UniProtKB/Swiss-Prot annotation:
The gene is NEMP1. Glycans are attached at residue 125. The transmembrane domains are required and sufficient for its oligomerization. Residues 336-444 are annotated as: Required for nuclear localization. GO terms for cellular component: nuclear envelope; nuclear inner membrane. This is Nuclear envelope integral membrane protein 1. The chain crosses the membrane at residues 161-181, 186-206, 216-236, 245-265, 289-309. InterPro entries: NEMP_fam. Together with EMD, contributes to nuclear envelope stiffness in germ cells. Required for female fertility. Essential for normal erythropoiesis. Required for efficient nuclear envelope opening and enucleation during the late stages of erythroblast maturation. The modification Phosphoserine is found at residues 368, 424-425. It is found in: Nucleus inner membrane; Nucleus envelope. Pfam families: NEMP (PF10225). Phosphorylation may regulate its interaction with RAN-GTP.
Amino acid sequence: MAGGMKVAVSPAVGPGPWGSGVGGGGTVRLLLILSGCLVYGTAETDVNVVMLQESQVCEKRASQQFCYTNVLIPKWHDIWTRIQIRVNSSRLVRVTQVENEEKLKELEQFSIWNFFSSFLKEKLNDTYVNVGLYSTKTCLKVEIIEKDTKYSVIVIRRFDPKLFLVFLLGLMLFFCGDLLSRSQIFYYSTGMTVGIVASLLIIIFILSKFMPKKSPIYVILVGGWSFSLYLIQLVFKNLQEIWRCYWQYLLSYVLTVGFMSFAVCYKYGPLENERSINLLTWTLQLMGLCFMYSGIQIPHIALAIIIIALCTKNLEHPIQWLYITCRKVCKGAEKPVPPRLLTEEEYRIQGEVETRKALEELREFCNSPDCSAWKTVSRIQSPKRFADFVEGSSHLTPNEVSVHEQEYGLGSIIAQDEIYEEASSEEEDSYSRCPAITQNNFLT
């Protein structure tokens, strides 16, 4: 190790102050070994660090320490951008992520915790280390397990479609949570998915119901829960390999457990209690907010979108309110425009359309069960004419149509104009005779 101290131990010659003979030499040897271990654990360690650059591949064949410095300030368009350090090797390697060079020096120093944690760390030949957009520096240590291992390290900054899909899923759960909680398709599909993914957790939960209280078996059950979660994580990481090698067993498991989950969901049925539906709705909306926050890499933009979503969901149509308010303000600032008057032709057409519509509504009401036929017939003078009207005949007789044409038709309009002109001429003649009569009166 770099910076370590090698201690050479020579046999003792003759008796010393720490003892005599063989016993004294053993004591001195033990103290020297312990002091050497102490110096090895506390000595300053010089770490050879390779600085990584984006999109530049660094290839190594030995254990090495790497650091990446993020100098770019995140912008609003980086909400779905992810920075990752990819380590791809020909054989299994162990990757340890730390914050800075000081932590790398601590990894090089001997400690009981580092010794045991090295056995617990997962060994992979292709791994990704996520780097935060606001993280200034990220360091990692790559340790090879076998000789002749070749690996490459590269920093990737790219648009991550997974983040975008997680954000869309959060939007859907938040705005459609009330609809999904009442949907039978969502109920059965969610039940089957939970049954397939968490079958071990469900089995452990069922077994815990049959265990007596204050039993030491609960310790085993807690360990079973942790082991089940670890197995689920391991299966998802190696899902492609499992499908390629054991697709028959995986397909049989999915079909069997899926059918059993569907049977259990069918037995209990969808939620019917309104309070249970509300609880499921709130749970889905809370999950949607969490997905929305985790799907955006910039925290303050994520919080702003969550606040907008809450306002849009809880306030009744705030955009429509804002539009109506702006419209009223603009109308108040402008001068009122007088309404446009209808022409004679438009007035006639509108009257015919509205009359025809009102007559059709009257026929529908008379044919409906709400209309009392006997009471209606007893109040009208011509029941047969009313019956013909209800069956689709005209509401006017030919005589009434001719009278209407004479009064309001084209000929009647001309006659009215002539009468108006005659009346106006008579008024003018009477006005012209009035001054002469007045003058004669004064003369007499």
